[in-house]
Design a protein with these regions (language model features):
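Charged docking surfaces used in two-component/phosphorelay signaling
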Residues: 15-23
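Short hydrophobic/Thr-rich beta-strand motif most characteristic of the beta2 strand and flanking loop
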Residues: 25-32, 40
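Conserved phosphotransfer cores of two-component systems
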Residues: 42-44, 68-74, 94
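Active-site residues of response regulator receiver
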Residues: 52
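Receiver (REC) domain active-site loop signature in two-component systems and cognate sites
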Residues: 55
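Hydrophobic/aromatic residues positioned on beta-strands within the core alpha/beta folds
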Residues: 79-81
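C-terminal output helix
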Residues: 104-115
Length: 119
């Protein structure tokens, strides 16, 4: 079973996505910021992190950068999402595997997640 960590300060949104992913057969966990997300990654060793770009404490770009810098987490797929256009996000960080603009269509998100986990 593939494990996905959803990191988003909008916890209701994260929990809804988590429930949808669980219905699709994934094991999911949620955290509210990048700092909590990094701590959780060490415990659960996910194959994918669905990461909100704009969060307090540690934003998505900083968490993604930390994941890419550590040899033990460098392989984890990152799906960055934001209400900002992707061009604005890429100005600050571009080492993610895919981007999803909020609000997103659930079917599009599921398809993207499935393709990331197959790669």
């Amino acid at each position: 079973m593939k494990t996905i960590l959803v990191v988003d300060d909008e916890l209701a949104s994260a929990e809804v996505l988590s429930l949808i992913l669980e219905e699709e057969g994934y094991r999911t966990f949620c955290t509210a910021n990048g700092q909590q997300g990094l701590a959780r990654v060490r415990d659960i060793q996910p194959q994918l992190v669905v990461l909100d770009y704009m969060m307090p404490v540690m934003n998505g770009a900083d968490m993604a950068q930390a994941l890419r810098e550590m040899p033990e987490t460098r392989h984890i797929k990152i799906l960055m999402n934001s209400s900002l256009p992707e061009d604005a996000v890429r100005l600050h960080f571009s080492k993610y595997d895919a981007f999803l603009r909020k609000p997103y269509n659930v079917d599009v998100a599921l398809s993207l997640i499935a393709s990331l986990l197959k790669a």
